[in-house]
Amino acid sequence: MSIKAEEISSLIKQQLEHYDDKLDINEVGVVTYVGDGIARAHGLNNALAGELLKFDNGSYGIAQNLDSSDVGIIILGQFDNIREGDRVQRTGRIMSVPVGDALIGRVVNPLGQPVDGLGEIKSDKTRPIEEKAPGVMDRQSVNQPLQTGIKAIDALVPIGRGQRELIIGDRKTGKTSLAIDTILNQKNQDVICIYVAIGQKESTVRTQVETLKRFGAMDYTIVVEAGPSEPAPMLYIAPYAGTAMGEEFMYNGKDVLIVFDDLSKQAVAYRELSLLLRRPPGREAYPGDVFYLHSRLLERSAKLSDKLGGGSLTALPIIQTEAGDISAYIPTNVISITDGQIFLQSDLFFAGTRPAIDAGNSVSRVGGNAQIKAMKKVAGTLRTDLAAYRELESFAQFGSDLDQATQAKLNRGQRTVEVLKQPLHDPIPVEKQVLILYALTHGYLDSIPVEDISRFQNELFDNFDSSHADLLKTIRETGKLPDDKKLSAAIEEFSESFAPSEK
C-alpha cells in the first residue's frame, strides 16, 4: 500500500493542529509514617492546606500540617492497609461530598456513603466540605420564625430561620431530645433537616432514626453519622460534610435546619489529631485554632438575601458541659460564636421540669425579631415572671407569712412552670401555644389546681379544635391575636365547664 506525499503532509498538519503542549505533572510523595488516623509524607512540596491527597491503595487524606520537611495528613476512613513507603499524590482539589435530593431519607457517613443498607445513592452533584461563609451583603436579617413546637423555646428563646442557637447542658439533660423534637415539628413546614451525629453510640443513633421514621420525619431529613469507633478524622469532618449538604438546599432558596450533636466530641477529635500531628497544645490541651474550627463552621449558617434566593440554614449546635460549667473553654467559645443559647439544667431535669430549660441563663439574641406578633404579646412578661418566681420561691422556704401579692406571684409562677412542661416527642403548633399562654397570662389558670394544669391544657385544645377552630386559624394564618373579647369568652366558657380532679 502506497502513501502519497500530500497525504503525509496533511496528516502531519492534522497532528500539529491537535497537539497539546501541556504536560501532565503529578506531584507524588512517599509515606514516612502512618498510625492513629494520621500519616506523614515526604516530597509533596507544593501541597496546599486542606488539599485532598490520594494514597496508592485508593484511600484519601487531607493535608493538615505543611512542614518544611514533610506534610502531616489526616486519613479519611480506615488506615490499616496504608504502609510506610507507599506513594501518595496530590489531587489539586479539596474534599467534596455528594449533595441533593437523593440524600433525603438516608443515613450516610461523613464521606456521603450510605450506611443504612438501602443501596447506593445516585447523586451527580458534589460540594466541597469547606466553603466560604456568605458575606455581610449576601445576608439579610433573621425575620421568619423556625417553630420548634416546644412552648418553653418558642415563648422564651425564640429561634429564627438562619439563626445559630446553641443547646448546652450536662449529659442526660435532654439536649438531643430537644433537637429531635424540633426536627419532628418541621413536618409540613417546608424545611429540610440534617441531623449530624458526632461520636454518638450506634445504638443511640439507631433509636433516633427509628423515632424520625415513626413520626414520618425521615421524609425530609438526612442523617450524617460518625460513630465513636470511627477514626478521629471522620468525627472532625462530619459537621462540615453535613453543612455542605445543607448549603446545596440553602443556595437553591430552601430553608434548612442542621443539628450538630455534639460539637464537644468534634473538638476532642480535633485535639487528638492536633496532638498526633505535634501541634503545640494550648488551654485544656486544645490547639490554638480550636475557636476557628467552630467559627468557620457556624458562620456558614445564614439567612440569604433575596438576590441569592432567600434560602436559610439554621444551626442548632449542641455542647456538653461538665457539672454545669459553662465557663469552660469550648462552651465559652461556642457561646460567643452563636446567636444565643438554651441552657439545660440537671437540677430542673431531675426535679421533673422537662424540658429543663433554665430561663435565666438562656437567651436568643435575634429570634425575637422573628417571633409572631401573637406570641410576642402573650409571652412578653413570661421571662421576668419566671425569674421573679424563682427568686421568691427561695425566700418562701423560710417563712409562711406571705402577703397576698407575693402569694399570687408564687401561685402564678407554679402554674407557669407547669404550663411550660412538655412530654417527649409531642410538639405543639404555635397557635395552640399562644392559646394556653394567653389563658395563663390572663389569669384563667390561677384557680386551677397545679396537678390539673396538663389536663386543662389538653381539654382546652380539644375544645378549641371542635368549637373554635376559626380562632386558631386566625392566629395560624395572620400571626396576630384574634378579637380579645371572643378569645376571652371562649376560654371563660371552657373554664367554667372544666371539672378539677377530686382529691
From Swiss-Prot:
PANTHER family, A to Z: ATP SYNTHASE SUBUNIT ALPHA, MITOCHONDRIAL
Topological type in the membrane: Peripheral membrane protein
Name the UniProt record assigns to this protein: ATP synthase subunit alpha
Primary gene name: atpA
Record-marked site positions (Required for activity): 362
Entry keyword set: ATP synthesis, ATP-binding, Cell membrane, CF(1), Hydrogen ion transport, Ion transport, Membrane, Nucleotide-binding, Translocase, Transport
Function field: Produces ATP from ADP in the presence of a proton gradient across the membrane. The alpha chain is a regulatory subunit.
InterPro entries (alphabetical): ATP_synth_asu-like_sf (IPR023366), ATP_synth_asu_C (IPR000793), ATP_synth_asu_C_sf (IPR038376), ATP_synth_F1_a_nt-bd_dom (IPR033732), ATP_synth_F1_asu (IPR005294), ATPase_a/bsu_AS (IPR020003), ATPase_F1/V1/A1_a/bsu_N (IPR004100), ATPase_F1/V1/A1_a/bsu_N_sf (IPR036121)
Species for this entry: Lactobacillus helveticus (strain DPC 4571)
